[in-house]
């Protein structure tokens, strides 16, 4: 498996209403995309920065021997 399991979870804003800009990994495009997080609930596919998302979910598949 190339990515951590939580990278495949859908973006989940949770049940609260804080409307915080966050990033999630989109496996279909192999890119990190912005979404708005409510501040509670949700899942682990939720990163404060695009770089953190990229390092965790995109870069984890790069540079591995085939």
UniProtKB/Swiss-Prot annotation:
Q: List the disulfide bonds.
A: 7-57, 16-40, 32-53
Which residue range or ranges hold the BPTI/Kunitz inhibitor domain? 7-57
Q: Site Reactive bond for trypsin: which residues? A: 17-18
- Is Secreted one of the keywords? yes
What InterPro entries does UniProt report for this protein, alphabetically? Answer: Kunitz_BPTI, Kunitz_BPTI_sf, Prtase_inh_Kunz-CS, TFPI/VKTCI-like
> Mainly localized where?
secreted
The record's listing under Pfam families reads: Kunitz_BPTI (PF00014)
Residue positions, PTM Pyrrolidone carboxylic acid? 1
Expression sites by tissue: Expressed by the venom gland.
What role does this protein play?
Serine protease inhibitor.
Q: What is this protein called?
A: Kunitz-type serine protease inhibitor Vur-KIn
């Amino acid at each position: 498996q190339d990515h951590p399991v939580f990278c495949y979870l859908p973006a989940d804003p949770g049940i609260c209403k804080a409307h915080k800009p966050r990033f999630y990994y989109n496996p279909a495009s192999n890119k990190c995309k912005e979404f708005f997080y409510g501040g509670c609930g949700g899942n682990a596919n939720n990163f404060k920065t695009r770089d953190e998302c990229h390092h965790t979910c995109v870069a984890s598949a790069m540079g591995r021997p085939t």
